Amino acid sequence: MRSYSYIFFTLFGIASLLPYTLVADTQAKAKVAILYTVTTPQLKSDVERAVRDELSSNIELITCEEASIFKEIVAEGYVGQKPAAKYAAIYLEQVKSGADVVLSVCSSVADIAYAMRDISAFMGVPLIDINEEMCREAVRKGSKITVVATFPSAIGPIGRTLERKSREMGKHIEVRSVLVDGGFGLDKETFKSLMAKELKEPAESSDVIIFAQSSMAYCANYIKELYGKEVLSNPKFGAKAVRAALLNKGLIK
């Protein structure tokens, strides 16, 4: 018969492993809030898949939708006080709710995100414009850049972001825009045909084509293969920026 001391030390050895197992299983997940002001199922799927593909499964995604912000911007023709205040309030609410980083998806509100950079730095909760790194990459890759959008309110903020990036990089760029009017909400094949038609001439004189809206991302490879030009869409760049922010905070490895 085995001694009591043998049984005691065997149980003690097993028990000593339990705290480490519990810590590993209950490790807090990094919280990533994604802020939308307009959505489609395709848009949400592309953005959230890009974030999950870039990061491990050990994150918690929180989606925030506030369509009134976009509607007010379109109605007023610019980002007025009311939509800007709503946007800021949603960001602060996510901070209070424990978000570690907030990803801003809508291009029409990019100027608000830029204006809030000092506040987000003070809060310690990065507010990431999904277009920021895409625009940086576009400037790296060429000097003749075409911005494509289905909403006119998305074009101006993207242009200003491109201008900032070109200044930071000491590079002169030429930016033109293409508005694919009526393109938002179309089925995939109809939209791809419309994009092919609208971009045939601009593609010839472009080094880089960037899509101003996440809802257009699924069409990027099609246009790239069709015209042999560099085509950038923002979901993967936004996801990489989220990863960099979480790494900087020491929340992931």
Language model feature labels by segment:
Residues 20, 24-253:
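Non-catalytic structural scaffold of enzyme domains
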Residues 1-8:
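Bacterial N-terminal signal peptides that target proteins for export
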Residues 8-19:
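Bacterial N-terminal signal peptides
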